[in-house]
């Protein structure tokens, strides 16, 4: 181990003891897009013993510009991101354990994963999942690192339950969000800077150096050469529904878990269906073949229908590309599959 990590061990803030702690650590990465792949690669090379990745999507050609683990072969095969990431990370470091889950991040799927993790890295692309992470991290007392980037801008904040403001506190005071990678684009340097900060914060936490973390909200614009750190200690709220004295964890409630959602900027609707989940895969393929050519791998099915492109995952989710109307997406699935 010493030869592989020799340069890292020479960094006195880590050393041999810190390297051993990393080997015994477990990091959960929620999302395997640009931030998720950068963070997963960096932490795997650093020797974090167990890395768990959860992601609901598959590799597309537009991902290759900034999502560093993936290859053209992954895009051609429409490989689920979590599985492709696991394969590439295992080739980078065979000494560590990689777990991959091809499913949506919901309260049900995320809670058992967060309970096992020492640190959670936020690499999601939507507000709802971030707030789920926030509530679950508060509930399980798990530290996590928020991160987001779009265009040439990026931001991050480390959240330690019981010590720092949570994301719900922050969003009450600081407007965050708006544009997305799909609407405003993104350049890789913005991704790499946010991910580098997230990795550094994770290494500090995993090696027991909580005193070294960034105590604030950091935002920057790599194109316009701006960088700002905001002191957010004052935004922590005693009455916060997520981290206050009488927390109720609002984003863990069923009413905050929609069965269908428009994916921002992608002209795509995701539909979750228990009925779809119960149909045997071979039966589903048989039905779809009456409509057109079915492409399949171990994790998903793909078919074109009229002006729509439909991708069906093993966990009962379907992506209907070509619409941003939930009713239309449900209607398409009803015609194609009979739901």
UniProtKB/Swiss-Prot annotation:
Catalytic activity: [molybdopterin-synthase sulfur-carrier protein]-C-terminal Gly-Gly + ATP + H(+) = [molybdopterin-synthase sulfur-carrier protein]-C-terminal Gly-Gly-AMP + diphosphate
Example GO molecular function: ubiquitin-like modifier activating enzyme activity
EC annotation from Swiss-Prot or TrEMBL: 2.7.7.80
Keyword Transport: no
InterPro entries: ThiF/MoeB/HesA, ThiF_NAD_FAD-bd, Ubiquitin-activating_enz
Gene Ontology BP, a term: Mo-molybdopterin cofactor biosynthetic process
Pathway: Cofactor biosynthesis; molybdopterin biosynthesis
Co-factor binding comment: Binds 1 zinc ion per subunit.
Gene Ontology CC annotations of this record: cytoplasm; cytosol
Keyword Nucleotidyltransferase attributed: yes
Classification via Pfam families: ThiF (PF00899)
Binding positions for Zn(2+) per the UniProt entry: 166, 169, 240, 243
Family that this chain belongs to: Belongs to the HesA/MoeB/ThiF family.
Protein name: Molybdopterin-synthase adenylyltransferase
Gene that encodes it: moeB
């Amino acid at each position: 181990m010493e030869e592989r990590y020799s340069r890292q061990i020479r960094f006195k803030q880590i050393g041999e003891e810190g390297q051993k702690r990393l080997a015994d650590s477990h990091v959960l990465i929620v999302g395997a897009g640009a931030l998720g792949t950068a963070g997963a690669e960096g932490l795997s090379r650093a020797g974090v013993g167990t890395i768990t990745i959860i992601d609901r999507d598959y590799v597309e050609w537009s991902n290759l510009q900034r999502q560093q683990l993936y290859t053209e072969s992954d895009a051609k095969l429409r490989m689920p991101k979590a599985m492709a990431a696991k394969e590439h990370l295992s080739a980078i470091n065979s000494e560590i354990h990689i777990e991959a889950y091809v499913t949506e991040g919901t309260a049900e799927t995320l809670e058992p994963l967060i309970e096992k993790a020492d640190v959670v890295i936020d690499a999601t692309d939507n507000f709802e999942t971030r707030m789920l992470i926030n509530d679950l991290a508060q509930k399980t007392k798990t530290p996590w690192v928020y991160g987001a980037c779009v265009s040439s801008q990026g931001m991050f904040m480390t959240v330690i339950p019981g010590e720092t403001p949570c994301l719900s506190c922050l969003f009450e005071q600081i407007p965050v969000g708006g544009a997305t990678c799909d609407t405003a684009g993104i350049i890789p340097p913005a991704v790499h800077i946010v991910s580098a900060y997230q990795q550094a914060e994770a290494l500090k936490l995993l090696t027991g150096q909580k005193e070294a973390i960034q105590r604030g909200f950091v935002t920057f614009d790599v194109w316009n050469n701006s960088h700002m750190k905001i002191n957010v200690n004052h935004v922590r709220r005693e009455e916060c529904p997520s981290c206050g004295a009488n927390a109720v964890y609002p984003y863990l409630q069923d009413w905050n878990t929609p069965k269908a959602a428009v994916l921002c900027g992608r002209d795509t609707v995701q539909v979750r269906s228990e009925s779809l989940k119960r149909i045997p895969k071979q039966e589903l393929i048989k039905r779809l073949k009456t409509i057109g050519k079915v492409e399949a791998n171990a994790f998903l099915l793909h078919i074109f229908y009229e002006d729509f492109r439909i991708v069906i995952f093993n966990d009962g989710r379907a992506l209907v590309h070509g619409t941003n109307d939930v009713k239309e997406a449900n209607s398409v699935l009803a015609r194609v599959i009979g739901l």
